[in-house]
Amino acid sequence: VSAPRQVVVLGASGFLGSAVVRELAADPTVRVRAVSRRPVPLPERLAGRVEVLTGDLTERDVLARAVAGADAVLPFTARIRGASGWRLSEDDQEAERVNVGLVRDLVALLAERPPGAGGPPAVVFPASNTQVGRVTAERIDGSEPDRPEGVYDRQKHAAESLLKQAAARGLARAVSLRLPPVYGPGTATADDRGVVSTMIRRALAGEPLTMWHDGTVRRDLLYVEDAARAFTTALAHAEALSGRHFLIGTGRARPLGEVFGAVAHAVSRHTGAEPVPVVSVEPPAQADPTDFRSLEVDPSAFTAATGWRARTALDEALDRTVSAVAREAGAASRP
């Protein structure tokens, strides 16, 4: 099993996209093309292995140039939050254009490939485990019927469906990886804005960590390096996985009260100060019912097919993330 030679990462300056670029660039048999609005920061040892293109991928000619000659495409471009910084609204046309339209354009470009341009490329898509919608069980394995509820989940589901149809037509070897919340060190172009890093920033500032519930709501949280490795693993197995979606996660959801407590202690280990308190507060008016439902991921189908599994322990992942966030905060405070 081997990864494709020319791999194009779209949205390569984002939090997860940049981690996947680093993972791919470490493989000398792979040529990486990193495409985004902003240049992708790379360690000096990897910079010579990556072709960097900048441009607006919602412009079809830019996308066409980006994916020309690709053996594989990983589309990480996404709009997650609305203009208010909160969840997407129904009338957010820019979000639809980025989250669905870009994949629609990609499929159209693949359909226009001339005969003899090589076999169908691998496409590994970052989906969300919440696009299943409301489920009665707290543990899901990917076999459940999908009933996506929120705008973002419906858009992810629509894009995933387009790629499954492309696989059925023989246009791509398309695989969808449905991710839980991913956390870890950010980059110069993309902070991790998820709940874990948000709480780390609060703890570093000496502020209490607030929960909208009693702390028993459980979440499966995945370290960014484990997530990036899932994508490179899926690329290497794209032929066998094509046309399907797989759940990715640790297989163990943790109570958020326990996670926040672990964050407080990780920051305490870094600073030497006492751990900040973890407290329950009233939820804001815009809180969603999904914020109060537990969800655990069973990734065994993907593990059985590829051998991948999450391998970074929570405390180790938190220590790495705390160190990175503290460095960012220190750099930002210097004149």
Where are these regions (language model features)?
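Amphipathic terminal alpha-helices
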Residues: 6, 27, 313-335
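N-terminal Rossmann NAD(P)H-binding glycine-rich loop of SDR-like oxidoreductase domains
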Residues: 7-26
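NAD(P)H-binding glycine-rich loop region in Rossmannoid oxidoreductase-like domains
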Residues: 50, 54-98
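Conserved Rossmann-fold NAD(P)-dependent oxidoreductase catalytic core, especially the SDR/UDP-sugar
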Residues: 75, 104-151
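Active-site Tyr-X1-5-Lys
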Residues: 134, 149-175, 204
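Glycine/proline-rich active-site loop of Rossmann-fold NAD(P)-dependent oxidoreductases
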Residues: 157, 170, 182-197, 207, ...
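Substrate-binding strand-loop-helix patch
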Residues: 186-193, 215-228, 244-266, 311-312, ...
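Mid/C-terminal beta-alpha module of Rossmann-like enzyme folds, strongest
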Residues: 237-287
